[in-house]
Amino acid sequence: MGQPGLNRRQLLAAAGGLAVAGSFGFAALGTGADALASGADTRVRYWNLFSGGDGYNMIAMLDAFRKDNPDIAVKDSTLQWGSPFYTKLAMAAAGSRAPDLGVMHMGRVTGFSPGRLLDAWDVDLLAKYGVRQQDFNPQLWNRGVIDGELYAVPLDIHVQLCFYRRDVLKKAGLLGDDGRMVPVTSADEWFDVLKEAKAATKKGLQTFGFWHSDQNFQWWFFVAFYTQLGGTWFNDAGTEVTFDTDKATQVLEFLRRHITDGYADPNFGGGAGAEQFVNGSPFVWEGNWSVPVFDAAKVDYGATPLPPVFGKQATHAESHAFVLPHQADRGGPANEAAHQLAAYIVKDAQQWALGGHIPAYRPILSTAAYKKMTPQNEYVSAMDHQATEPKVWFAGSTGILAQDIGPIVVSSTTGSAKPDAAARRMKSELTRLLATKNPMDGRTAAQGGAVA
């Protein structure tokens, strides 16, 4: 594979702006003594974006790998989450300074110029270390396939969830005999549940928190419920917008109703929903990464996938995945060790599940240990009804699609725009994005081979 034909300005514009360029050197290279100082025969340079609890879990998994594979030294570097990470990874891949192994959100893979900034995985080498396609959810595995080649190996899916407090729901008569929230199958049932829960909620607390002014969360929730309605985005060729404004309006009206009916307080912004939940609010919609937070707070709670208010189960999902940043001379012991390390972590993701993520490697999900994990065992079904962003270059976590469309959803949810007008604006933005060229390679979605 030849050197990618991308210049510095294209990369910076694509991945997040010129402001991060000056910080490229130090964070990407990591700190401390070289990993080969341990006396190991092979070194693997590994970049990730995991901080907080995820960071601790990843370090524990890397230490386990080091103990089991003393001949392989892992030099890991943690970079800033979001656009800075993707900028540095792109620049490294284009400048012959790429690590042997990296992590990306699956939704960003299509836009990362597979074949130019990412190298394809050797599926036979992965199989040698126990990672095979049949051990993964087909939808999830195929998200990493571009033009017939595998460019991303899924580690997990992370999903948006409906967290609920058992103490409040028990008082409201909303717990079943199994101690879980009563099932909800329609929008009317959901608002009936909120009405009953509100009557049992302590004064001064909102009934429901859902990050109403946050563009990312509102976009994620929109994706989930639009998918429940069977909504589509583009045709398979990536040449036509198929976005349904009537269905979009229905979703936007549903989101807005949480505020107009008095269940979500518009004066509470940011992470106030989680704080109120800890203090006794009955519901909050949050990502599964909040599991360790609520565990630490000693809250008696459960968590389900987002309610199927439009009849079909679908919960917004993204995925952390392992990738091979482009190296002109990829191959040899370091490349094989990168395959071995990725396979080891994917198969050993029981530890990773402690952070709330659902392991992508399905054999883990059937183990007795995983089945005992709560509330993980309550929402594991989300693996089989993932609502994902369209497979286009401008999608994915912190991507252009969320940046451009998310604020429109917020404007409807918070009341500064009417839902039907917001839906039309969303379609207009989708039309513009579809015709826009990816700065990574100068191709539109139609030219980029977006269909797996």
Regions found by a protein language model. Name each.
Residues A40-S51, I72-S77, L101:
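Short, well-ordered beta-strand elements
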Residues F191-K198, D236-N267:
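Glycine-centered hinge/linker elements that transmit conformational signals in sensory
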Residues D147-L155, Q160, S186-E240, F283:
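Extracytoplasmic/periplasmic solute-binding protein
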Residues M106-L161, G302-T304, K372, D384-H385, ...:
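Hinge/lid segment of periplasmic solute-binding proteins
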Residues A64-F136, K171-G173, E275-Q276, F283, ...:
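Extracytoplasmic "Venus flytrap"/periplasmic binding protein-like
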Residues Q139, T304-P305, G355-S411, T436-A452:
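Long, aromatic- and glycine/proline-rich binding clefts that accommodate carbohydrate-like moieties
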Residues L49, M61-L62, V109, W219-A224, ...:
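Extracytoplasmic/periplasmic substrate-binding proteins
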Residues Q10-T31:
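N-terminal export signals
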